[in-house]
Design a protein with these regions (language model features):
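C-terminal catalytic domain of photolyase/cryptochrome flavoproteins
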Residues: 1-142
């Protein structure tokens, strides 16, 4: 979701990568939950998160080469996602607090979020490692 990947690219990947990727499992889980491609027909909100939630849920950040609040691209990607799709989510009461917080973000932070999204998608689409591009994501304070 954070990268705006075409949802059927994800289902195609699952079908190619896993012999047990049956439509009745992949379609609702990948399209409905993972990609929020069905809108609110199946789920009440997209399943995306920023760095604070990831840190709270486990020790994933301890082995990462990015600093959780200074260089990690996840939170800027999170905010860029909501900025890009805020109109679609405006009537969703479960996202009201997220959208209010988004409104409070400065224009500078929003510009940094958008640039991080562009940098990450470009880097990954070129088959490069984000860790090699670590300097692109500096000053990403959450």
């Amino acid at each position: 979701q954070l990268m705006d990947i075409e949802p059927h690219q994800l289902t195609d990947w699952f079908h190619a990568a896993f012999v047990d990727a049956f439509d009745w499992v992949v379609e609702p889980n990948v399209l409905g939950m993972g990609a929020f491609a069905l809108g609110d027909a199946m789920m009440t909100k997209p399943y995306v998160s920023g760095t604070p939630y990831i840190k709270k849920m486990g020790d994933f950040c301890t082995s990462c080469k990015f600093h959780p609040t200074k260089s990690c691209p996840i939170s800027p990607m999170y905010w860029a996602y909501f900025e890009r799709h805020k109109d679609a989510f405006s009537g969703n009461h479960r996202l009201a607090m997220t959208l209010r917080t988004l409104q409070k973000r400065s224009d500078e932070k929003k510009a940094n979020d958008a640039q991080t999204f562009l940098d990450v998608t470009k880097t990954l689409s070129e088959g490069k490692s984000l860790h090699a591009q670590k300097t692109l994501f500096s000053n990403n304070e959450v």
